[in-house]
């Protein structure tokens, strides 16, 4: 560490490091190895690793701040906290950090009113495992930026995948990045920008999250067990938030048994053109893909309604319109391997009411379920023809084009409509398993 330690803290084994006057940087160009289960911590306002760091079954930490506290039990890390931010806070890894079966933490804490913090990984972060569950990797830059163009891996050869959490105000996952939490006996968990439907308040919510084309994110089970969980999120209640996902996202079930996992891509504004999503299972139940912006229109183009300027990691997203769009072909492709839920929120700081509009024909031979769950209205302006079941939930369901569901005779799953039904067209369920629950007057 380039931070100071008070004599009293040293004598009482209090690992508190604090800037006292000037503090230099910490740069590693060599090899640093800890005994099994031990801890390695590089602490300074600016920290850079251009060498190799290894702490098998232990902890490797790169921490940026003006005051940092570690809690150790012997050589084992129990807790850490960056208690005071710093100007030009920077943590970067350019080569390799390995903590097999252990924990890797890259954390930068800036002074928000002066400068943002930055965490950059262009190398390899590996907390994988052979026999056990994969380890844990955390990248954190609250009120700052995270840029990843390397490999982050908590996979397990025989166990289940581990945990990866990437949290910052702005997150950019560059082409050719790999973020992996696969496991032979079950998939792990990958959280980028938030938790599932913001269910964990301890996971910091991003304002802007970008996953570029050519990125691989995988929380699949390999042989046995269920697929894991992948969340790519920005705060859906913040009108400025934007989530862009163009990469390949997987949470597949095991090839021998197990169900598919679940994938969420959400943001107040959302663009997912040409995304590839797979939560399938060869022998179990297919998993789920949840899409949750404010208003959304299903179109034949899925054009982005925003501009991106600047250079990584300092990107600027500027929305040109409120509504999000999704290309109907991306839905059709994903239905082949996943149940899909498109949900709108329509509450909080956003300017819209949470409508879903279908403006392009949607035809699929898959027997997986499509769910449209609107905070307010669902408007069907183009025909939907599905082999599988469909669920429509909203205050009003307006049918200006026909819906055909269950055209595959082998499918007997229930389709349902919840909401006041109106419009000039109708709903056909080939196998006659249709439930309509309406409040108020309905015309159909």
Where are these regions (language model features)?
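Extracellular and secretory-pathway beta-repeat/beta-biased strand scaffolds
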Residues: 1-444
């Amino acid at each position: 560490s380039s931070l100071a330690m008070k004599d009293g803290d040293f004598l009482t084994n209090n690992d508190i490091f604090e800037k006292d006057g000037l503090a230099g940087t910490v740069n590693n160009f060599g090899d640093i190895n800890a005994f099994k289960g031990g801890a390695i911590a590089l602490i300074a306002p600016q920290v850079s690793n251009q060498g190799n760091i290894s702490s098998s079954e232990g902890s490797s930490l790169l921490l940026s701040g003006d005051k940092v506290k570690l809690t150790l039990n012997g050589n084992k890390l129990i807790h850490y906290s960056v208690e005071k931010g710093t100007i030009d806070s920077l943590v970067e890894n350019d080569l390799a950090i390995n903590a097999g079966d252990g924990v890797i933490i890259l954390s930068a804490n800036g002074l928000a009113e002066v400068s943002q913090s930055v965490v950059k990984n262009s190398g390899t972060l590996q907390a994988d495992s052979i026999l056990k569950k994969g380890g844990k990797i955390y990248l954190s830059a609250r009120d700052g930026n995270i840029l990843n163009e390397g490999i982050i891996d908590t996979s397990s050869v025989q166990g289940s995948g581990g945990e990866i959490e990437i949290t910052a105000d702005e997150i950019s996952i560059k082409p050719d990045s790999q973020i992996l939490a696969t496991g032979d006996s079950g998939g792990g968990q990958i959280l980028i920008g938030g938790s599932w439907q913001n269910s964990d308040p301890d996971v910091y919510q991003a304002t802007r999250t970008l996953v570029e084309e050519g990125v691989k994110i995988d929380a699949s089970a390999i042989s046995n067990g269920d697929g894991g969980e992948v969340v790519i999120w920005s705060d859906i209640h913040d009108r400025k938030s934007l989530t862009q996902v163009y990469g390949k996202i997987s949470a597949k079930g095991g090839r021998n048994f197990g169900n598919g996992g679940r994938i969420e891509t959400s943001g107040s504004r959302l663009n997912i053109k040409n995304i590839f999503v797979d939560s399938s299972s060869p022998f179990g139940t297919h998993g789920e893909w949840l899409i949750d912006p404010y208003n959304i229109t299903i179109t034949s183009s899925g054009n982005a309604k925003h501009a991106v300027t600047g250079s990584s990691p300092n990107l600027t997203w500027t929305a040109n319109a409120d509504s999000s769009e999704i290309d109907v072909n991306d839905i059709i492709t994903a239905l082949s391997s996943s149940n899909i839920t498109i949900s709108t929120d329509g509450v909080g700081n956003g300017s819209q009411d949470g409508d879903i509009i279908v403006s392009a024909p949607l035809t699929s031979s898959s027997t997986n379920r499509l769910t449209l769950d609107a905070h307010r209205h669902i408007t069907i302006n183009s025909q939907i023809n599905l082999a599988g079941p469909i669920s429509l939930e909203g205050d009003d369901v307006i049918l200006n084009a026909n819906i055909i569901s269950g055209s595959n005779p082998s499918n007997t799953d229930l389709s349902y409509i919840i909401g006041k039904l109106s419009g000039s067209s109708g709903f056909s369920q080939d196998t006659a398993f249709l439930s309509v629950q309406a409040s108020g007057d309905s015309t159909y």
